[in-house]
Amino acid sequence: MLPLYFGPPSRRLFGAFHEGSPGRAQSLGVLLCNPFGQEAIRTHRLYRVLAGRLAQAGVHVLRFDYFGTGDSAGEDDAADLESWRDDVLLAQRELQHLSGALEFTWMGARLGGAAVVRAAQQMPAAEPHLVLWDPVVNGPAYAQLLRAKHVEALEISYSLPDPAWRRQLQTEPASFRDEAIGIAVSPAMREQLAALREDQLDVPLASDAFVIADPANRAVQAWVAAQQARGARVESVGLPQALEWTSDDSLNAALVPAQAVQELLLAIDR
C-alpha cells in the first residue's frame, strides 16, 4: 500500500493506493468512495479488506478521503456533497495516473453512492461501472436520520437525558442540524441534502450500476425501478440482514459483514 497526497495545494486529498499484484495485473482500476461521518469510520476497515482482496487479484485500487474528512486537508465543516463530487473526479484522475488502467469501477456507500452518481454525470465519456452500496437517494430523509441518531447519541452519553431533546427533534426542524454524532454538518451540506431527490441521481446511459441494498429500503428500490424504466443499465441485489450504519451503540465499531464483502467483490468484478 502506498499512502500519498494528491490534488492542488488548496485542496490536498489523502489517498492509499493498492497496486494490483504484478503476477496477476489487470487493466481494471477501482475507486472506493466513503460514506459520511460515523458511517465512514465504521466502513474504514471494510474498505481496507476490499482493497487488499482486489489488489491480490491484480486490480489497482485507490481509497481516499474527501476534503475536510479523514486525513485530507480542511476542517469537517468544509465538506459538502458538491465538493465530494469534484473530489471523486480528482481521485479518478489520480487513479488513472497511478495505475494506467483502461477500465474503472467506482464504488460508493451511502452518501458516497450519491457522490459517485453525480460524478459520473460530469464524466459520461469515462463510462465507469458503478457499485452503489445502500445509496442515499433522498436527502431530506437522510438528514432527518442523522438528526435522530444524533439525539440518540446524546441520550446514551448522559445518564439523565433531557426529554426536551426529543420534543425539539419533532417540533423544531432547525434543531440538531449542525452536527451528526461528533461530525460537523456544513451549511452547504445541509442545503444540498435538503434539495437531493431521486430524479437528480440519473445514472448516465453510457455507464452501468449495480446496487446492493436492503430490500426493505423502498426509496432505493423505487429509484432502481425508475432508472430501469428510463433505460439505464441498473441491477440490484438485496442483503437479507439490514445493516445499522449509524449507531452510537456501535460507535467506532468496524462494519465488515462477510456477505456484504462477497457481494461487493462480485459486483466490482462484473
Pin down the residues of each PLM region.
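Short beta-to-alpha linker loops that shape the active-site pocket of alpha/beta-hydrolase fold enzymes
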Residues: 36, 60-70, 136, 240-242
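The alpha/beta-hydrolase serine catalytic core
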Residues: 125-267
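Catalytic nucleophile-loop/oxyanion-hole region of alpha/beta-hydrolase
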Residues: 69-103
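Active-site signature of alpha/beta-hydrolase-fold catalytic machinery across serine-
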Residues: 118-122
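Gly/Ala-rich beta-loop-alpha elbow adjacent to hydrolase catalytic centers
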Residues: 107-117, 134
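Terminal, non-globular segments
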Residues: 5, 15-16, 55, 62-63, ...
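Short glycine-enriched, charge-decorated loop/helix-capping segments at active-site entrances
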Residues: 46-47, 75-80, 250-253
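Short, surface-exposed "cap/lid" segments of acyl-processing enzymes
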Residues: 7-10, 19-65
